[in-house]
């Protein structure tokens, strides 16, 4: 019986990936379709893709598949054959290739069976996910931009919106998609008759969100086909005006793809223009935040003086401090508000020391 999961440490896998000389293609895809036996489907795909040295993150559920992966160029055709033949619903499925790609997006294949391919928190049994809004292609998106009766709604997390978005798009400020859905309905409830243009990274979230808004009585709901990735690729290919500014945030080692030259975000520590996402170097924190090169040097890659101080302790001292702290300080959050709270506490503590 073959081993259908990884048994090697992340560090060794990452080192192995960085030492690779073969070229890779980063891509993403999703498909909503009925799947009777997700576990069996998962094991079949894992066996095939592991042999092809595919890396990445794949979620499989009774409602379909959602994947962000990297594939060796030499195995790309074999991978496509495997995917297209895996299920009739996946034949010739659109693959969103990365806008910027250094081939270092993933270093291990993780394939999981889940209840949903995107965590939506929807428990209403009358909800029909197949009743979705109308697709918009790139040129149609640009026409809709001109329509004063159309509202563009960003169906991504707030930290994704922060570094890049469609001009004048509405931000639904949340950390998760499940929080965002009811929040969007509440925020937009006075505009149910207007045209709602939903978008996300690759299309999976805005497709389900379009069905959710229709379920809640919105009349004219659209979503960008293929998400930001397909819109940008098509607009550049056809020399169309590009109305997305900044970076497209991605959930892999790259953390972002440059779309336009504008830098619209700010360093969370000094407020200088910056759109580089990093994780705090203190492994007990690992906060996702925006940090410029100057602050990275000043804080040793940490989100605050607290984490910087902890990082400089011996491993045993770090363990004791974390044990004493317990779960009282919540720092595992992608929210700038949480970061500001940590930084303010650092300033207060420093002031007390100086006093």
From Swiss-Prot:
Signal peptide: none annotated. It is an enzyme of class 1 (oxidoreductase). Keywords: Oxidoreductase, tRNA processing. One of its GO terms (molecular function) is oxidoreductase activity, acting on paired donors, with incorporation or reduction of molecular oxygen. Residues 146-240 form the Rhodanese domain. Pfam families: Rhodanese (PF00581), Rhodanese_C (PF12368), UPF0176_N (PF17773). SMART domains: RHOD. InterPro entries: Rhodanese-like_dom, Rhodanese-like_dom_sf, Rhodanese_C, TrhO, TRHO_N. Coiled coil: none annotated. It catalyses: uridine(34) in tRNA + AH2 + O2 = 5-hydroxyuridine(34) in tRNA + A + H2O. It comes from the Bacteria. The active site is at residue 200. Its EC number is 1.14.-.-. Belongs to the TrhO family. Catalyzes oxygen-dependent 5-hydroxyuridine (ho5U) modification at position 34 in tRNAs. This is tRNA uridine(34) hydroxylase.
